[in-house]
Amino acid sequence: MIYISHLTDDAQMKNILKETGAGLECIEFSVSDNLDRLDERLPRFEKRLKEMNVSQLTMHGPFLDLNPASYDSHVAKVTRLRFEQAYAAAGKLGADKLVLHTGFIYRVHLPEGWAGRTADFFNEFLEGKSGITVCLENVYDPGPRTMIEVKKRVQSSDFSLCLDIGHAHCNSDVPLDEWIEAFAPYTAHIHVHDNDKSWDYHQGLGKGTIDLGNVMPMLKASMPDASVTIECSDPGDILTTYRVLKDYGF
């Protein structure tokens, strides 16, 4: 299943969804102001979903200033609160997946103990929950190893990984094919966009320096059941990327 991140206005998104038949990845509740007003904002957004004729939905959760592996108990509590609010919103809207960032920033956070603390957080967070797959996404993570450690330590079958190929290409020295090979058994969701490695531009596939001829067949072969979200804001980039995905059998 292909989804498109809600990075354009509703009118453009409605037309794009009609043209492609794709689902929507909601970013509305990645914003703390909306999480603080769920009772007010959820009904409004449900109406907007109907107006856009959204048929399938995933959700991107909050990430700014949050860190599930934080040593600071108050930061950890706020992270838990925001993730709980996003999970509740995902349930009410009928989203099947909730994408959450690791919060790890290379050369800011120490890698020692990070996997254990993150796994402890998600084991507690997911206790008693089912029906929504939580997908942990790489952003500034330098390589796949520690995220795989987290996946192996989290007990819930509703916990998986989200491979963002644009982030891996831009923010890691590990080649993309090594990310794909390592993540393959653990990935339920993929984010696609392109860049030239100098900045996380979220361009359409083919506009940056990702080797599509190598990466796309490898993704399709090694993660055949993973859903995919196009994370571009320019309508032209969205449609170009959609066509690339279809050309490679997604």
Question: Which residues does each PLM region occupy?
Answer:
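Active-site acidic/histidine proton-transfer and metal-coordination neighborhood
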Residues: 68-160
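Hydrophobic faces of well-ordered beta-strands that scaffold small-molecule active sites
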Residues: 2-6, 22-26, 57-60, 98-100, ...
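Histidine-acidic metal/acid-base catalytic patches
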Residues: 10-20, 96, 144-159, 169-250
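Active-site beta-loop-alpha junctions enriched in small/polar residues
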Residues: 5-9, 27-31, 62-64, 103-105, ...
